[in-house]
């Protein structure tokens, strides 16, 4: 937790422990600003933050009251009007800068990573190194093993100080950005130490700086309280006479003091156990900069803010660990290697967990302290700030950043944006600070000269130990670096086929040509400025500058360094482009022991939890009242974080470390089996109960009156009765018995089953030991029973149905009953008969068919019964419930299914499959009928002799449709004229072939006229072969052969007229006495309906008559009648011929 109101006072007075220094490096330019480097922020810890800026202008320091951050770097931006000069020869961005404008200095609002260790080491890069190969590990508490004494010095910096630095370039013109990759280096920073005096085993008493207090290392190790006392004394020292730094008109940094080293005894190691599975993440967010566009302007110091909130399970123990993961493309710090995360503390300053950072995996591992053993229901939140890792992201791109708390991930899409070079004419340049080494007091700057690879003439580059404006003019002021012959200046040439990373950060200089030696005679120094004469160039160059700086008189960092490029145009005029980088520091305070002003007093709250036997809400009014142990009490801080304790054996609890003026909330967990007692039962605040939750504000004193009382919750019963409702009226009658062994289930208001029982021999059931509340009772229907009607009468005499709700309110509830009656059973079946007349109706003369298999299926299609008809054709299925069924009849062999649904349900045939629904009654209407098919054969063979000429006229009616083709040879002349009309109700198709010259085709309602002219001898032999097919509702196939032989001795002319009219309707075989012998073979086939007809038994329709079957006999009669008529006319013609002779 951060005490924002006391931030300035904390900075001015006393020692502040657990404070981290953060540095942001600013780029000042007309219209642009950029910041490098990132840090982490963790709630509850302070940090000291530094900014680096570029360009000239007066600045007003602005204090920011950020709460908790970890190695955060932020930069102020100065935006001026700019114009763009297009140059397509290089992919680097172009930025045009106009007049320089004053820029207000901003101090970062985000705190940096808190150092856990008391001894911080720093690494310095004085020569080009391949940072890619470095593996900088978090610093450790080396002081615990050092044989050194502790020296507390008045006016020195707080311990555990981390410096985190970022850079911002500046110049006058914006051009295309470079596209070559860039790298990032982390440097662990430490403030300059005062010149040490050689002192062994001494501690300087802060109250008397001139007289050291002799304390041995062993004494400090064995007596940590002594160390705390020394620190406390130093914190209480009056610093009022110490001059306070006044912010100048340009830059007013705060003091960054030398580190103090303490030898502290380390606790015994505790076995580590990852408990990520016991960490519940409640909220995670990722925000880039202001969160409006998700653009990470890496040179403008736009940070990536990761916020996470989580709870710590009560199973977590001291020594257990959890993890926080950064995305692989970000780093907590850009200019330093100080990536050690600060401790997670609660608002009172107690440490919950200590963290270490693994640079290779970019993972923080937090180890829990004994805080988790003392407190319960801990809620924590963490805010981590990081920055784009220029080593893994050398150029502008789009990323999907992923962070994770305890393995639970969240992601955000981000666009990475880098700065533009400053351009004016052919002059184009850009620069950033890349590394800060506070131990050696050096700062590294990397400069891109002519990154656009223009053809520049008379090129000179100035490196100034102060800011420069956009015209290259040096602006003297605070924070000057030292630029002289001892300044390390390296120059590298970029080949034409190489592209500079847009990140403006080089990690491996070996890939470029080192041309430093070429400038031995082209480099001059004057007035803290180095000038390099490049002459006429068309290539890009990199300058790496490592310069010394001198801290300000109060020990704070104030670093500024500028660079400018000047060229001449074709008219001989100079074009300037400049960048400035500078660093300033600001202080942020956070949670922890060191963040509290020495003079600030902390307070406590608490008191007592008791069992209020008489429920009056007043303590001590009943001798049976007693304290309640192990009651969970939770304190919620103003920032929403919580911690919990349990009452001791005397019912007491206490929370300390609370601040005056702050408002807190205390909540009491109601113990199982108890209820909260009456609130404010008396005006005596020391004796009343404050209820389950109370809010309190600290008003300059402790508050030990926050009490609460509970009483045991009474228990109740619920239940009643299950009976057989024989008359089905839903009312419990005196003569109706209970039903035993009925299952009853009890559920609470959430639907959770809390009990199951069965009724006893008298139908009674009961659930006991129940609290007030709403319950649900479910009755299981007994086998063979049906639920009766419900809610028909008074509550204690009716049936509540299968499911009912029961309410207990300070009394038993014995009114939940349910009634059932025995479920009736039904039968299904009827009759299978021989339908001799095929009309689909059961006639009295028609008999049943025995042994027909009948199958019964339920609604799911499952076979539930199979039977056979008895000798009378009867069948039945019994013991059936109401429902849907299907009856399937198996067709007997040799029989045909009769027509279905021709009359009433109980007299018709229902077909091979019948669907039926039983609803509270039997159904004996499911019948089916079958009949046997007819078949006939006849052969006809005739032989006749005739000797005559005849004229024949015949008229016949026929119910058939036939095609006839006959051919005959004869030694006589005959004329035949036949006229026939045919009208039939059926269609018959017959085909006959005969050897004659006549062709006859007749159809129903047809008029045919045929002429036959034949010449026959008295001796003739005729052979007739006809084949006819008839197809209607029946199939008829007949085959007849006719052989006739006639002799004649003369040739005569005869004119005879005979009329033959035959009309026959016959269903029989006939023989005729003549000289002809007829043998015919005919087959008759009658089509039948399918054997299985599936339809609803209660929806029958009468079938239409089968006309073709009924009229087949008439067709046969007509055919035979026609043959007899022909024979008769031949005989008659023969007699007349003989008479003429």
From Swiss-Prot:
PROSITE patterns, per database record: GRAM_POS_ANCHORING
CNA-B domain residues: 602-714, 715-824, 825-935
One annotated Gene Ontology cellular component of this protein: extracellular region
Biological processes per GO annotation: cell adhesion
Compositional bias (Acidic residues): 903-913, 930-1080
Motif YSIRK-G/S signaling motif, residue range(s) on this chain: 23-34
Residues carrying Pentaglycyl murein peptidoglycan amidated threonine: 1107
InterPro entries, alphabetized: Adhesin_Fg-bd_dom_2, Adhesion_dom_sf, Fibrogen-bd_dom1, Ig-like_fold, LPXTG_anchor, SDr-like, Sdr_B, SDR_Ig
Alphabetized UniProt keyword annotations: Calcium, Cell wall, Peptidoglycan-anchor, Repeat, Secreted, Signal, Virulence
Region feature Disordered, mapped onto this chain: 54-225, 899-1117
Skewed-composition ranges (Polar residues): 158-207
Protein localization: Secreted, Cell wall
Membrane topology: Peptidoglycan-anchor
Residue stretches of biased makeup (Low complexity): 77-90, 110-126
Span of the signal peptide: 1-52
Propeptide: 1108-1141
Region feature Ligand binding A region, mapped onto this chain: 53-601
Locus of motif LPXTG sorting signal: 1104-1108
Basic and acidic residues: compositionally biased ranges: 61-75, 92-109, 130-145, 216-225
NCBIfam families: LPXTG_anchor, YSIRK_signal
Known function: Cell surface-associated calcium-binding protein which plays an important role in adhesion and pathogenesis. Contributes to the resistance to killing by innate immune components in blood and thus attenuates bacterial clearance by interacting with host complement factor H/CFAH and modulating its activity. Also inhibits bacterial opsonization and killing by interacting with host complement regulator C4BPA and thus inhibiting classical complement pathway activation.
Similarity field: Belongs to the serine-aspartate repeat-containing protein (SDr) family.
Subunit structure: Interacts with host complement factor H/CFAH (via C-terminus). Interacts with host complement regulator C4BPA.
Protein name stated in the entry: Serine-aspartate repeat-containing protein E
């Amino acid at each position: 937790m951060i005490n924002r109101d006391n931030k300035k006072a904390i900075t001015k007075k006393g020692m502040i422990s657990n404070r981290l220094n953060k540095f942001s490096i600013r780029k000042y330019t007309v219209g642009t600003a950029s910041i490098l480097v990132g840090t982490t922020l963790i709630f509850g810890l302070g940090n000291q933050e530094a900014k680096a800026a570029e360009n000239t202008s007066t600045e007003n320091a602005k204090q920011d009251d950020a709460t908790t951050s970890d190695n955060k770097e932020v930069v102020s931006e100065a935006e001026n009007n700019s114009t763009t000069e297009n140059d397509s020869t290089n992919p680097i961005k172009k930025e045009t800068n106009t007049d320089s404008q004053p820029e207000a200095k901003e101090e970062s609002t985000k705190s940096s990573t808190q150092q856990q260790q008391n001894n911080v080491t720093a690494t310095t890069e004085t020569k080009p190194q391949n940072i890619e190969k470095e593996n900088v590990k978090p610093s450790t508490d080396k002081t615990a093993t050092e044989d050194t004494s502790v020296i507390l010095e008045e006016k020195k910096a707080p311990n555990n100080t981390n410096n985190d630095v970022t850079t911002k370039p500046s110049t006058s013109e914006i051009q295309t950005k470079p596209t070559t990759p860039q790298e990032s280096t982390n440097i662990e920073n430490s403030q300059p130490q005062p010149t040490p005096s050689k002192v062994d085993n001494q501690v300087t008493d802060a109250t008397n700086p001139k007289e050291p207090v002799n304390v041995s290392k062993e004494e400090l190790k064995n007596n940590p309280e002594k160390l705390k006392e020394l620190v406390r004394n130093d914190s209480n020292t009056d610093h009022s006479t110490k001059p306070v730094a006044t912010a100048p008109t340009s830059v007013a940094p705060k003091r960054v003091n030398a580190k103090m080293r303490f030898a502290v005894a380390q606790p015994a190691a505790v076995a580590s156990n990852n408990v990520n599975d016991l960490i519940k993440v409640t909220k995670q967010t990722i925000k880039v900069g202001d969160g409006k566009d998700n653009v990470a302007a890496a040179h403008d110091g736009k940070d990536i803010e990761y916020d996470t909130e989580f709870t710590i399970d009560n199973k977590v123990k001291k020594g257990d660990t959890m993890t926080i993961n950064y995305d692989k493309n970000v780093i907590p710090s850009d200019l330093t290697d100080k990536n050690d995360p600060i401790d997670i503390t609660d608002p009172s300053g107690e440490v919950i967990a200590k963290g270490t950072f693994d640079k290779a995996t970019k993972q923080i591992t937090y180890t829990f302290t004994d805080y988790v053993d003392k407190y319960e229901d801990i809620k924590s939140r963490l805010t981590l700030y990081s920055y784009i890792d220029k080593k893994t992201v050398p150029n502008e791109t789009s990323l999907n950043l992923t962070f994770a708390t305890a393995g639970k991930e969240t992601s955000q899409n981000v666009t990475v944006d880098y700065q533009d070079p400053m351009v004016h004419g052919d002059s184009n340049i850009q620069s950033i600070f890349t590394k800060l080494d506070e131990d050696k007091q050096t700062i590294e700057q990397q400069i891109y000269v002519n990154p656009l690879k223009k053809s520049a003439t008379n090129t000179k580059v100035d490196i100034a130990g102060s800011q420069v404006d956009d015209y290259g003019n040096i602006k003297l002021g605070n924070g000057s670096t030292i630029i002289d012959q001892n300044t390390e200046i390296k120059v590298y040439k970029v080949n034409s086929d190489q592209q500079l990373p847009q990140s403006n950060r080089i990690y491996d200089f070996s890939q470029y040509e080192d041309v430093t030696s070429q400038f031995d005679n082209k480099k001059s120094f004057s007035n803290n400025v180095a000038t390099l004469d490049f002459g006429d160039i068309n290539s890009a160059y990199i300058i790496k500058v490592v310069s010394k700086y001198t801290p300000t008189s109060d020990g704070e960092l104030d670093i500024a360094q500028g660079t400018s490029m000047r060229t001449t145009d074709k008219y001989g005029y100079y074009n300037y482009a400049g960048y400035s980088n500078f660093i300033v520091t600001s202080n942020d305070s956070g949670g922890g022991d060191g963040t509290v002003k020495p003079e600030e007093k902390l307070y406590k709250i608490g008191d007592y939890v008791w069992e209020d036997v008489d429920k009056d809400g007043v303590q001590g009014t009943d001798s049976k009242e007693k304290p309640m142990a192990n009651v969970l009490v939770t304190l919620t801080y103003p920032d929403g974080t919580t911690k919990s304790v349990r009452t001791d054996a005397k019912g007491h609890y206490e929370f300390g470390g609370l601040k005056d003026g702050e408002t807190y909330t205390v909540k009491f967990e109601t113990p199982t089996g108890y209820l909260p007692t009456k609130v404010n039962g008396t005006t005596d605040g020391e004796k009343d109960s404050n209820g389950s939750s109370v809010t309190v504000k600290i008003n300059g004193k402790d508050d030990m009156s926050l009490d609460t009382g509970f009483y045991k919750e009474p228990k109740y019963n619920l239940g009643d009765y299950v009976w057989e409702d024989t008359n089905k009226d839903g009312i419990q009658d005196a003569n109706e018995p209970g039903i035993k062994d009925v299952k009853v289930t009890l559920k609470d208001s959430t639907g959770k089953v809390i009990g199951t029982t069965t009724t006893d021999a008298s139908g009674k059931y009961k659930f006991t030991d129940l609290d007030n509340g709403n319950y649900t009772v479910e009755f299981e229907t007994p086998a063979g029973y049906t639920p009766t009607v419900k809610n028909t009468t008074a509550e204690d005499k009716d049936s509540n149905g299968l499911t009912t709700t029961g309410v207990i309110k300070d009394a038993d509830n014995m009114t939940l009953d349910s009634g059932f009656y025995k479920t009736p059973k039904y039968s299904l079946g009827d009759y299978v008969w021989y339908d001799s007349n095929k009309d689909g109706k059961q006639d009295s003369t028609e008999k049943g068919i025995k042994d027909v298999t009948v199958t019964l299926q339920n609604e799911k299609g499952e076979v539930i019964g199979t039977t056979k008809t008895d000798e009378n054709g009867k069948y039945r299925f019994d013991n059936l419930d109401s429902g849907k069924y299907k009856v399937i009849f198996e067709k007997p062999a040799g029989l045909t299914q009769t027509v279905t649904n021709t009359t009433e349900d109980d007299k018709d045939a229902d077909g091979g499959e019948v669907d039926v629904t039983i609803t509270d009654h039997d159904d004996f209407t499911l019948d089916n009928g079958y009949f046997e098919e007819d078949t006939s054969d006849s052969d006809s063979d005739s032989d006749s002799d005739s000797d005559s000429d005849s004229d024949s006229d015949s008229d016949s009616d026929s119910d058939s449709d036939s095609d006839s083709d006959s051919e005959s040879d004869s030694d006589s002349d005959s004329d035949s004229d036949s006229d026939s009309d045919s009208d039939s109700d059926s269609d018959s198709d017959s085909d006959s072939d005969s050897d004659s010259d006549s062709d006859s085709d007749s159809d129903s309602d047809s008029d045919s006229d045929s002429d036959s002219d034949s010449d026959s001898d008295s001796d003739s032999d005729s052979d007739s072969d006809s084949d006819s097919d008839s197809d209607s509702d029946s199939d008829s196939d007949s085959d007849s052969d006719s052989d006739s032989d006639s002799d004649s001795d003369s040739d005569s002319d005869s004119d005879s007229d005979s009329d033959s009219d035959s009309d026959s309707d016959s269903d029989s075989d006939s023989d005729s006495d003549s000289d002809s012998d007829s043998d015919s073979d005919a087959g008759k086939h009658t089509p039948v309906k399918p054997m299985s007809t599936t339809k609803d038994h209660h929806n029958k329709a009468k079938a239409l008559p089968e006309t073709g079957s009924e009229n087949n006999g008439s067709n046969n009669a007509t055919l035979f009648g026609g043959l007899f008529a022909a024979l008769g006319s031949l005989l008659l013609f023969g007699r007349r011929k003989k008479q003429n002779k």
